């Protein structure tokens, strides 16, 4: 049965519809906001996998080109593998939703949001999030919903709910907030040095609308009736001999948890578990059915030890206090032939960032349903398996794309405008070691490598990952969390920014009682940590170098009148090709008359610039040129001043110097082979015997008539 509900959110109605499309799916919802429409479906498999310690959830957000009235570019006229944008939206949908599924369901779950229409004004990602959340909530799959999402922008000192693309572009804050009726579950966004209070107020603003959308979803239950949920695959079980296991390993496991060094600690913990496994195996108390339960019980003890130590003793597994940051080492210029490089090491996390400068030809062209774009800043994050001491495939996965995007957003607000710095910038982060917050290490190394490359960034940017350990009575905020603290904790909050404010952030919350005061405390602790990290980075490099790397391409720009573009190009591109060949530069001409020269030799580029300026320059009386004699006739000589300008040197003109004086003008030549017994040259050659075609001669413009014809006279050197 078709049901439709709507709610005013910002300037448009959010319309949710079910019962018309994709009725064979476990759940399907069509969501519309303005002219953007997304269909989200959810299905689960019939096969059951028992004793899983994770939710087998996959989210496959996809955009159809027909949604914007477009046909895919390229040779294959069909949508292909997911673009980075689709991967990022899939992660936005996945992260707040995953903790709300019951692991005991034991079936694979697939959520497929598909953009069917877009007005290129309202971003479809936020529409897809609410469509997906509602589809799962209305399905027969066990789910602890409802949840919803809202985007907030901050522009002209005002918060805008679900802003348009243009408003996002102009804003100083852009965040996506997801949450349930119990509280916030996810925040992600970028900013241009906003304060912590503005961020908190934006989250508050978003949450007010999130609760309204959650209530709207619950209205569907009253309209269509609550569906019977599919049964859980199994009841939660515990290891039968868990008490005996605790008595056997707890003390030894506690010691192992506080061994210094990630690899040593992991090895010590693994050894304790292995000894316990052998003990229970010898008693025939472990079998194929309860082996997973045995390891889960060991993990429960480990989590209990770590959390209890932090809550009661303010002691972390590596010996730090909650606010303490690991030792930091920062370096620049490690790689001599690159344009800029920096190494940032924080404890056992290490990121090498390399900046490469290119030309506008190197920009990434995005064929997108939201409109074609050209990106002149890219950050690529690589996380090879050796960074955690493992083997595996070298490939770019969703995690790498997501972490790279967060680091890119954190840095891009500090980059110069394209008109001021017309380079294409690519930063590559190679994570060489990882034990927590490698994306924030990427921000730090990336910021320093940009400065080392000579990119005139506005401010240094640093990042830090915050964590949370809490119980019913107390919470402890952790600065610079380890990988295990991320796994065992209640919150992962990454914050990047400058000394002036926040530029990037990402928060995932696993509990429901996170208050505004808690987030305020976390942001303040993050700010203090960020200032400490910035001070260390600034001691290595505190501002951009005055010049770009000698290994980077050089760029020279000039502006000409639009009607002069054809002069620079020349007939069939002859003129611009000659400039390219003569000066070894690459010339790019824009429709607005902006010309960009790319090359490696500054002197040749300046000469090429001067050449172009001479081509488009309007000649003036009295100017002197080194002209080329192109043609001689009986009346005088045609002199090429520039590839597009010629003047006429008459045989009646008089030089202002003595070089071509009377002895030359009145010279006579005899030619014995002449039919008339005298030289057969033109009278001009007789008067100016030193001039020959192809000769370079210095001339002065003596007159320009109303038709633009140029008269010349010989000039002094």
From Swiss-Prot:
Q: What residues does Mg(2+) bind to?
A: 486, 492
Q: Enumerate the spans annotated as S1 motif domain.
A: 622-715
Task: List, alphabetically, the GO terms of the cellular component aspect.
Answer: cytosol
- Region Disordered: start and end of each range? 650-681
- Taking every annotated instance into account, which residue ranges of this chain make up the domain KH? 553-612
Keywords of the record, alphabetical order, are: Cytoplasm, Magnesium, Metal-binding, Nucleotidyltransferase, RNA-binding, Transferase
Q: What class of enzyme is it?
A: transferase
Q: Member of which family? A: Belongs to the polyribonucleotide nucleotidyltransferase family.
Q: What NCBIfam families does this protein's entry cite?
A: polynuc_phos, PRK11824.1
Its name, as the record gives it, is Polyribonucleotide nucleotidyltransferase
The source organism is Borrelia duttonii (strain Ly)
Q: Print the organism lineage.
A: Bacteria, Pseudomonadati, Spirochaetota, Spirochaetia, Spirochaetales
């Amino acid at each position: 049965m078709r049901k439709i509900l709507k709610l005013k959110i910002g300037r448009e109605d959010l319309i949710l519809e079910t019962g018309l499309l994709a009725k064979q799916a476990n759940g399907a919802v069509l969501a519309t906001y303005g002219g953007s429409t997304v269909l989200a479906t959810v299905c689960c498999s019939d096969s059951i996998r028992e004793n899983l310690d994770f939710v087998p959830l996959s989210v496959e957000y996809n955009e159809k080109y027909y949604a914007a009235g477009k046909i895919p570019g390229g040779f294959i006229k069909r949508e292909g593998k997911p673009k980075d944008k689709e991967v990022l939206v899939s992660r936005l949908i996945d992260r707040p939703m995953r903790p709300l599924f019951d692991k005991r369901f034991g079936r694979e779950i697939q959520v497929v949001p598909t953009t069917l229409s877009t007005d290129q004004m309202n971003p479809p990602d936020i529409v897809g999030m609410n469509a997906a959340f509602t589809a799962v909530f209305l399905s027969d799959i066990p789910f602890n919903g409802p949840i919803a999402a809202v985007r907030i922008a901050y522009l002209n000192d005002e918060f805008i709910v679900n802003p348009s693309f243009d408003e996002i572009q102009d804003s100083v804050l852009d965040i996506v907030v997801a949450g349930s009726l119990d509280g916030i579950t996810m925040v992600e966004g970028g900013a241009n040095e906003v304060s912590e209070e503005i961020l908190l107020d934006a989250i508050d603003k978003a949450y007010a609308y999130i609760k309204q959308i959650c209530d709207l979803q619950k209205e569907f239950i009253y309209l269509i009736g609550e569906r019977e949920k599919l049964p859980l695959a199994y009841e939660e079980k515990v290891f039968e001999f868990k008490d005996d296991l605790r008595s056997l390993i707890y003390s030894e496991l506690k010691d192992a948890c506080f061994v210094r060094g990630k690899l040593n600690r992991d090895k010590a913990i693994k050894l304790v578990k292995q000894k316990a496994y052998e003990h229970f195996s010898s008693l025939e108390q472990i079998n194929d059915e309860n082996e997973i339960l045995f390891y889960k019980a060991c993990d429960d003890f480990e989590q209990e030890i770590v959390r209890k130590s932090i809550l009661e003793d303010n002691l972390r597994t590596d010996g730090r206090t909650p606010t303490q940051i690991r030792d930091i080492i920062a370096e620049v210029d490690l790689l001599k032939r690159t344009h800029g490089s920096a190494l940032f090491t924080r404890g056992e996390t290490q990121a090498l960032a390399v900046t490469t400068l290119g030309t506008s030809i190197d920009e990434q062209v995005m064929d997108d349903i939201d409109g074609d774009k050209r990106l002149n800043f890219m950050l690529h994050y690589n996380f090879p398996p050796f960074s955690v001491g493992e083997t595996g495939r070298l490939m770019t996965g969703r995690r790498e794309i997501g972490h790279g995007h967060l680091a890119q957003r954190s840095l891009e607000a500090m980059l110069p405008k394209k008109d001021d710095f017309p380079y294409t910038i690519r930063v590559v982060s190679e994570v060489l070691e990882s034990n927590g917050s490698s994306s924030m290490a990427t921000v730090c190394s990336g910021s320093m490598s940009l400065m080392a490359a000579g990119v005139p960034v506005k401010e240094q940017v640093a990042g830090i990952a915050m964590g949370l350990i809490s119980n019913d009575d107390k919470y402890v905020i952790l600065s610079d969390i380890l990988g295990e603290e991320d796994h065992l904790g209640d919150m992962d909050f990454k914050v990047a920014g400058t000394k002036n404010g926040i530029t990037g952030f990402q928060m995932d919350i696993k509990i429901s009682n996170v208050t505004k005061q808690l987030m305020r405390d976390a942001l303040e602790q993050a700010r203090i940590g960020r200032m400490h990290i910035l001070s260390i980075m600034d001691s290595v490099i505190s501002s951009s170098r005055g010049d770009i790397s000698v290994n980077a391409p050089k760029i020279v720009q000039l502006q000409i009148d639009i009607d002069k573009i054809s002069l620079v190009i020349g007939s069939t591109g002859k003129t611009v090709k000659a400039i390219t060949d003569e000066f070894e530069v690459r010339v790019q001409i824009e429709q607005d008359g902006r010309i960009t020269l790319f090359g490696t030799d500054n002197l040749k580029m300046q000469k090429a610039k001067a050449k172009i300026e001479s081509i488009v320059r309007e000649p003036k009386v009295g100017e002197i040129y080194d002209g080329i004699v192109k043609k001689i006739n009986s009346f005088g000589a045609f002199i090429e001043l520039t590839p597009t300008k010629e003047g006429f040197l008459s045989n009646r003109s008089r030089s202002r110097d003595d070089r071509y004086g009377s002895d030359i003008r009145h010279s006579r030549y005899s030619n014995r082979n002449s039919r008339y017994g005298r030289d057969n040259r033109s009278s001009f050659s007789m008067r100016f015997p030193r001039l020959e075609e192809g000769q370079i001669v210095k001339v002065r413009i003596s007159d320009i008539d109303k038709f633009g014809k140029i008269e010349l006279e010989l000039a002094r050197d």
